[in-house]
Amino acid sequence: MLIPSKLSRPVRLDHTVVRERLLAKLSGANNFRLALITSPAGYGKTTLISQWAAGKNDIGWYSLDEGDNQQERFASYLIAAVQQATNGHCAICETMAQKRQYASLTSLFAQLFIELAEWHSPLYLVIDDYHLITNPVIHESMRFFIRHQPENLTLVVLSRNLPQLGIANLRVRDQLLEIGSQQLAFTHQEAKQFFDCRLSSPIEAAESSRICDDVSGWATALQLIALSARQNTHSAHKSARRLAGINASHLSDYLVDEVLDNVDLATRHFLLKSAILRSMNDALITRVTGEENGQMRLEEIERQGLFLQRMDDTGEWFCYHPLFGNFLRQRCQWELAAELPEIHRAAAESWMAQGFPSEAIHHALAAGDALMLRDILLNHAWSLFNHSELSLLEESLKALPWDSLLENPQLVLLQAWLMQSQHRYGEVNTLLARAEHEIKDIREGTMHAEFNALRAQVAINDGSPDEAERLAKLALEELPPGWFYSRIVATSVLGEVLHCKGELTRSLALMQQTEQMARQHDVWHYALWSLIQQSEILFAQGFLQTAWETQEKAFQLINEQHLEQLPMHEFLVRIRAQLLWAWARLDEAEASARSGIEVLSSYQPQQQLQCLAMLIQCSLARGDLDNARSQLNRLENLLGNGKYHSDWISNANKVRVIYWQMTGDKAAAANWLRHTAKPEFANNHFLQGQWRNIARAQILLGEFESAEIVLEELNENARSLRLMSDLNRNLLLLNQLYWQAGRKSDAQRVLLDALKLANRTGFISHFVIEGEAMAQQLRQLIQLNTLPELEQHRAQRILREINQHHRHKFAHFDENFVERLLNHPEVPELIRTSPLTQREWQVLGLIYSGYSNEQIAGELEVAATTIKTHIRNLYQKLGVAHRQAAVQHAQKLLKMMGYGV
């Protein structure tokens, strides 16, 4: 819940000097990316910008405090300020910020700018007190913001120092409007106006000018002088002489003498107590100070000129001038030290009553009241956890004694989930084990079950499926039906374990159950996870179309719940890329993989390994070995600088081994084979993939017997577990083994099986990747004209893809080849006496490559009737009567020239 006063522009006060010269400068702010107002405290930055903002509608205001160094809090308020300026135009960003569904501030801002692209009128965003930001991540994100913000948006930053926002670059490009302390300082004329409206007896212009010079036009000093002159009999000039040369860090003594010592004791205590509040309203004041009619008291303080300002148009929220507020808080620690804990407790209670637990925690921490902090956490911690207030929760839990956590195991569980969310898996188990050792009777019942559900999640994340299964089953046995979150976790883990074991049907059912529960209780990240798992399972079973449809449901969920920036989004677009690649939709597959990299742009480069492997796979399917090599260099660098799950390593190894096969790099394959992991089992698609990598390397090295043993065992497992996509891949690799070993009939047999199975999987690129050896076999099958219709159609499609991406599109009948052919001593006399034209040679090459007449016409960009003429002519010159005879003739010519066909 956001505090309204932090998003309200300060109300323009009566008796303020209108800074006409500065307002004139600010009138052109819409021509700049950044308007920067910098000066020490008390120079009137906020007052000036509130005057400038008066009457503007398309403006958002965000007043910072120390707590805004938390990235999530900063994001929530900044987006809320933009929503304020645009009347709710950026709904997607607002939801993402509220639910913390973004990868980083920069990615959230990128989405913001997409939405703002449709907002065409001038827009202003004011951030006050930016000097309070010390978080380097926020600084970097705001630099990104300024670089990429729309042209019609102007950012207005108020700060006591020069912020780390790339100011020099903006200045050079004339995109910065600056107002500093020298310009903010009051002129003689402004000082005279100020005193005239503050003092009952006007002072002479010369006197006013001298006072202004004495304090260098410092607005706060002028305000103190006016206050002192009203409260005392001595002259304004005497106060000015005392203030001359004093700056904000040396004001304490003066403020004690001239302000606190000149108000009655009740007002003094009111000021000191209320100052602990970063913002205040009637209810807070009444509870903290003990005075009735808090609103009236605040208005009275405002009228006395005691540095109190309204924060919103309703007049409900107030705050002290930062300079005066800091002074009062320091004095409160000195003068009311004994009462201070009780004052903070009162503030915490009032904030809680108004529904602001994070503010209440701030005061409970300041009070050092562990019991109050514990009670707030017990009631609100999980809500704060679900809203990613992780830093605040961590600080709060550290402030509680261990005994308090033991007395409230829910807080131990919360601390463990915090650790899990930060991937500190070892610490989770240590914490839970310590708690179980020290908490009596916790080894049974609901809390123990919740511990086990979390432990199960940690175990599966850490690559221990057997332990994860044991713990998930224990949790589900003990958890009551109403403990939905832990039941969702345990069910999801159990489904993932069964997936790892290759029990796909049972795993699919559990993941569907997880999805149903997660949707019912709005646990969207587990709903998304379960859909991704379902898609992977369906892919493994060979039901790629159903996997596609499940992915569509996942994309719809992401759009509806604005989950675009969760890391799981990358997982989804990556498995979509794998499916598109299988279907030879390479451009779409590549685009999907690149979008996955974009999702992970704010994370460590190692996280991009899988998408990078997918890009390499696309290059390999196109036969683009130069590009594949370039990308492989980066992939191998990432492999050497990270620790990865075995599935990730297997996918990375796959593209490496295929590349070595295509380039004939036996040395690299042999070296890899000596060192690579050889899994104990092959009962899921991760392990099948690694063993397939091993078999491919063995085939490249001529170790056919070893490779055949591996592949036969893989096929046995794949058939028994119904891993149909793996079976399809295994058959293709077995085909290559038989072909290279000279076992042509066995090669044809398993190729026919692979083509038949591809009717279910839809595989294309898995055939294409095998290149010319696959093309030769498919040409022979097509020539035999015995394939069923579906297999015939698929074989022709695969052949077209190979011809497009591997070797030459026109077989080998280019100009150089034809010249060498005609000079060959064994060339048929018919060809020598009646030579084909260059175009007819091209047509012959395309016929040999399996192209139909329509496809040849499309390839050569001529009419189909023209192609028929070319075919008739070349048939006559070759002395053949039909297409199959032409293919056989071309094959003889290629063999004569030394090409293996």
Curated annotation (Swiss-Prot):
Record: residues binding ATP: S39, P40, A41, G42, Y43, G44, K45, T46
HTH luxR-type domain: residues covered? 829-894
GO molecular function terms here? Answer: ATP binding; DNA binding; DNA-binding transcription factor activity
Biological process (GO), any one: positive regulation of carbohydrate metabolic process
Superkingdom as given in the UniProt entry: Bacteria
List keywords of the entry alphabetically: Activator, ATP-binding, Carbohydrate metabolism, DNA-binding, Nucleotide-binding, Transcription, Transcription regulation
Q: What is this protein called?
A: HTH-type transcriptional regulator MalT
Organism lineage? Bacteria, Pseudomonadati, Pseudomonadota, Gammaproteobacteria, Enterobacterales
Q: Gene name? A: malT
